[in-house]
């Protein structure tokens, strides 16, 4: 096990890695560009690269940059900011309606649902209601089981950023603070955990295992081990940051085994910020000196033998097909991916035969999506799958029927619409999603009937809400549209997509920006906070769990800050006029001498002075 090969060297912090046949796709820090590294001479070391998508720069806080890059069952590549359709080596990006899907890490299940997490917002499982590719509804308030948000840490070390501690229990973490590196367990070695989501929490020194249950018309998430955790340690240097369901069916996780894992922006070492005390504590404890001790663990179930790992690259396209039934999701995914990216249509007859003969629902779905990726999925195959005994296959077939539904196939439309009467909530919801996937005039009557017939479904109600939000966004002026993109990427994880703040226990992670007096009456001060940041999790005497607002003066220019302020002002606070880049430049000049983040006391003083200038009320 203790072997490694250096394939790519002399690069700075590669963040995303995805094997793609004989190439490896990589995204590096401070960039969104995707590079394909290759090894043309076959010596096991990359000898060149080519750009497959020019994403430009993405500088600033490394916590906010890209992660993920996974191949999904729908032949789409996902990361936390974009999903990329793949066709003959070309990538075409499309963003999410929520901006950023996840903070650090991305996972998928056998059905193609994508799972996100947020660190500062204390969320260890997000956005898992629908298969990837659809609008993402707001369901966090109704999808979590009792005590799901409570970590059961046994490490008594106070070194967190914003998680909060129970001091009656000797500084045991009481709120999730650093969720990351999630993966869905998809292995025949661990059938009891199949479909469960493992999420790393390096501040709590634990790995949470989440299980999902269909209840009351929604998929709810619960801690698999109530009152405890899947893996946890009292060792203060145990820092699990990444997990994978491996090709051999075993569970792997990466432990940085490090004293400090926080990047510098949220780890001040001098000044008046209350977090400087944390730096002083951990320095005194010697934690700054513990690094370069990382390790990878493999968890093998008792009395089980790891699965044999096939060398898929050496297999012919026809030889790949049986591996769609392999016991490891990792192997299944790569077999399907290779079938698609090779583009070898000679295997289409074999795939069609496999779809008819296999009794494995997951393998059947993978084969059908491989046929779609080869532009060879027949109508007859979809029709037959719509009548499959497995609801799981039916959902995939409805999803795959969209090409025919929106292409005018009335007979198939009638067959799919009839499935709205299914006893399975996933089937009913997929009927709704597939008919509403595009604004097709010929389907308007069916869409209207579904709006009425499925109106009581909880997820339909939430989906219609986000549809209305997208219609409203379409009417935004160009400045607000640009600001909405920045807001969703940067601000929503703490302040909420609706601007009303993200819940954390009985309070919020950060202040609500909706009908916010600072935005409405002192927009210059609010702009100054964006530029310089705020130390201390308090505003107007009210505490928040987020810790602090980082400075953005070196991340965004005046035009970008004007755009995000305009979006916040017009969307949440009834501004009548946009903020201009000239106004931001004036504020930037006014606070240039401010060398540290604003404290709550300094902000209150500015408010008493009626702002930085004599502000014009923007209401």
Report the location of each language-model feature.
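Beta-propeller domains with acidic blade repeats across secreted/periplasmic ectodomains
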Residues: 1-319, 330, 338-340, 396
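The canonical Cys-X-X-Cys-His
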Residues: 243, 251-254, 296, 483-498, ...
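Post-cleavage N-terminal segment of exported redox proteins
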Residues: 301-311, 373, 403, 436-481, ...
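Structural detector for internal amphipathic alpha-helices that build alpha-solenoid repeat scaffolds
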Residues: 307-310, 332-343, 362-376, 381-387, ...
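Short inter-helical turns and helix N-cap capping residues of alpha-solenoid HEAT/ARM repeat scaffolds
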Residues: 327-328, 359-360, 389-390, 423-424, ...
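Gly/Gly-Pro-rich "capping" loops immediately C-terminal to redox-active cysteine motifs
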Residues: 499-558
């Amino acid at each position: 096990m203790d072997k490694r090969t250096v394939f790519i060297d002399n690069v700075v912090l590669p963040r995303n890695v995805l094997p793609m046949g004989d190439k490896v796709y990589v995204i590096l820090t401070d960039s969104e560009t995707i590079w394909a590294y290759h090894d043309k001479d076959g010596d096991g070391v990359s000898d060149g690269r080519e750009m497959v998508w020019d994403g430009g720069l993405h500088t600033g806080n490394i916590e906010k940059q890209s992660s993920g890059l996974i191949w999904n069952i729908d032949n789409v590549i996902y990361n936390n900011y974009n999903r990329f359709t793949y066709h003959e080596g070309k990538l075409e990006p499309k963003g999410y309606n929520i901006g950023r899907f996840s903070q650090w890490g991305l996972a998928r299940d056998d059905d193609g649902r994508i799972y996100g997490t947020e660190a500062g917002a204390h969320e260890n499982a997000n956005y898992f209601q629908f298969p990837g590719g659809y609008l993402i509804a707001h369901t966090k308030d109704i999808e979590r089981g009792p005590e799901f948000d409570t970590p059961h840490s046994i490490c008594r070390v106070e070194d967190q950023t914003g998680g909060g501690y129970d001091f009656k229990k000797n500084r045991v973490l009481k709120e999730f603070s650093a969720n990351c590196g999630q993966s869905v367990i998809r292995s025949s070695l661990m059938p009891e955990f199949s479909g469960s989501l493992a999420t790393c929490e390096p501040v709590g020194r634990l790995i949470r295992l989440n299980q999902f249950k269909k209840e009351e018309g929604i998929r709810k998430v619960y801690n698999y081990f109530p009152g405890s955790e899947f893996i946890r340690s009292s060792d203060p240097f145990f820092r699990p940051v990444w997990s994978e369901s491996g090709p051999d069916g075993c569970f792997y996780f990466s432990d940085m085994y490090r004293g400090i894992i926080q990047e510098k922006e949220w780890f001040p070492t001098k000044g008046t910020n209350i977090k400087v005390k944390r730096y002083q504590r951990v320095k005194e404890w010697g934690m700054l000196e513990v690094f370069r001790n990382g390790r990878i663990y493999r968890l093998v179930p008792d009395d089980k033998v790891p699965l044999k790992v096939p060398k898929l690259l050496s297999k012919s396209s026809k030889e790949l097909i049986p591996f769609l039934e392999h016991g490891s999701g990792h192997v299944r995914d790569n077999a399907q991916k290779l079938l698609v990216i090779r583009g070898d249509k000679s295997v289409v007859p074999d795939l069609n035969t496999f779809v008819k003969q296999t009794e494995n629902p997951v393998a059947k779905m993978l084969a059908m999506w491989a046929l779609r990726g080869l532009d060879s999925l027949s109508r007859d195959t979809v029709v037959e799958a719509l009548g499959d005994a497995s609801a799981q296959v039916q959902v995939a077939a409805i999803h795959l029927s969209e090409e025919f539904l929106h292409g005018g196939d009335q007979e198939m439309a009638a067959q799919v619409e009839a499935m709205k009467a299914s006893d399975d909530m996933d089937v009913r919801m997929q009927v709704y999603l597939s008919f509403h996937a595009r604004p097709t005039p010929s389907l308007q009557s069916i869409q209207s009937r579904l709006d009425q017939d499925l109106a009581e479904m909880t997820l339909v109600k939430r989906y219609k809400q986000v549809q209305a939000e997208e219609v409203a966004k379409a009417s935004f002026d160009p400045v607000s549209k640009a600001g909405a993109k920045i807001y969703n990427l940067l601000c929503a994880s703490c302040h909420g997509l609706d601007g009303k703040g993200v819940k954390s226990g009985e309070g919020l992670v950060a202040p609500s920006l909706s009908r916010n007096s600072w935005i409405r009456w002192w927009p210059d001060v609010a702009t100054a906070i964006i530029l310089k940041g705020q130390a201390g999790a308090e505003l107007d005497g009210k505490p928040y769990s987020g810790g602090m607002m980082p400075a953005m003066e070196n991340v965004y220019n005046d035009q970008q800050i004007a755009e995000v302020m305009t979006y916040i002002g017009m969307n949440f606070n009834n501004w009548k006029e946009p903020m201009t880049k000239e106004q931001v430049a004036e504020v930037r000049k006014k606070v240039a001498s401010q060398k540290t983040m604003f404290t709550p006391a300094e902000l209150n003083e500015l408010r008493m002075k009626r702002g930085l200038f004599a502000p014009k009320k923007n209401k």
